[in-house]
Swiss-Prot record:
Full protein name: UDP-3-O-acyl-N-acetylglucosamine deacetylase
Natural source organism: Thiobacillus denitrificans (strain ATCC 25259 / T1)
Cofactor(s) the protein needs: Zn(2+)
Active site (UniProt): 264
Enzyme class: hydrolase
Catalytic activity: a UDP-3-O-[(3R)-3-hydroxyacyl]-N-acetyl-alpha-D-glucosamine + H2O = a UDP-3-O-[(3R)-3-hydroxyacyl]-alpha-D-glucosamine + acetate
Pfam families: LpxC (PF03331)
An example Gene Ontology molecular-function term: metal ion binding
Length: 304
């Protein structure tokens, strides 16, 4: 059968929160089958646990924040994206602060950390959510939807009025049956504009942001000395975010995700809409490799 996965050994990283600017130590630990992804605020007394769950997402200004009682964990989407990309089902994430460290603004450092710790299979069947009917949410001209598809595919379009975006791709279609997440998506960094920085900081956001962990643009160009990592890095980062936001469902999705100008709020609204329509999805597990959509066999090679 296709089995659930966790880490072989614990692994640690330290960094600053993109929005809080606070230094945080994060420890990723193996977890039991069927426990899902659980964040633990070990700096609180008593320590607070927050499970990856679409209904715990409260603040979606520029990131996805989980909140339960007095405990919050923000900017979970890049780590969640790496976990989805590597097919990790169960994990404990111990944090000494309110935010996942931003690292370099992409999910590549998390992919490296997870692969360094080693990934192991567990004696329990992996449960997928298979989309059986289209589900869509809209907000003005923005929209996001799931449609049935035997695999995992994302089509995303962004629309920013800025000279840099005219040169970069605005639409990307990624079918994971023939594309590796770690190679084509994981290195895409978060991005922002100089003119927004002052406003964001007054709102208590982006306090840890810098050219080391984001693509920053003025009115005309990218300010980072090394330029872009992919020609279409902006829209690929939106794909990276979406993969992380959607993995808050707690299961890999068999289906296609299509979006126009979607962000954390709409991604979360789509998950909640899906859960409201029990007839639009089903749980599936696979006894044999040959029954699994090739997107998932390719997405999740087991580390040696």
């Amino acid at each position: 059968m296709i089995k659930q996965r966790t880490l072989k050994t614990p692994v640690k990283a330290t960094g600053v929160g993109l929005h809080s600017g606070v230094k945080v130590e994060m420890t990723l630990r193996p977890a039991a089958p069927d426990s899902g992804i659980v964040f633990r605020r070990v700096d609180l007394e008593p320590p607070a646990e927050l499970k990856a769950d679409p209904y715990l997402v409260t603040d979606t200004r520029l990131c996805s924040m989980l909140e339960s009682g007095a405990a919050k964990v923000s900017t979970v989407e890049h780590l969640m994206s790496a976990l989805a990309g590597l097919g990790i089902d169960n994990l404990l994430v111990d944090l000494t602060g309110p935010e996942i460290p931003i690292m370099d603004g992409s999910s590549a450092p998390f992919v490296f950390l997870l692969q360094s710790a080693g990934i192991v299979e567990q004696n329990a069947a992996k449960r997928y959510v298979r989309i059986t009917r289209p589900i869509e949410v809209r907000d003005g001209d923005k929209w996001a939807r799931f449609v049935p598809h035997h695999g995992f595919k994302i089509e995303f379009t962004i629309d920013f009025k800025h000279p840099v975006f005219d040169k970069s791709g605005k639409t990307v279609t990624i079918d994971f049956a023939d594309t590796a997440y770690t190679k084509e998506v994981a290195r895409a960094r978060t991005f922002g504009f100089m003119h927004e920085v002052e406003y964001l900081r007054n709102q208590g956001l982006a306090l840890g942001g810098s050219l080391d962990n984001a693509i920053v643009m003025d009115e005309y160009r990218v300010l980072n000395q090394d330029g872009l990592r992919y020609d279409d890095e902006f829209v690929k980062h939106k794909v990276l975010d979406a993969i992380g936001d959607l993995y808050l469902l707690g299961h890999p999705i068999i289906g296609a995700f299509e979006a126009y100008k979607s962000g954390h709020a709409l991604n979360n609204a789509l998950l909640r809409e899906l859960l409201q329509h029990r007839e639009a999805w089903e749980f599936v597990s696979f006894e044999h490799d040959e029954d699994v959509p090739s997107a998932f066999l390719r997405l999740h090679p087991l580390a040696a």
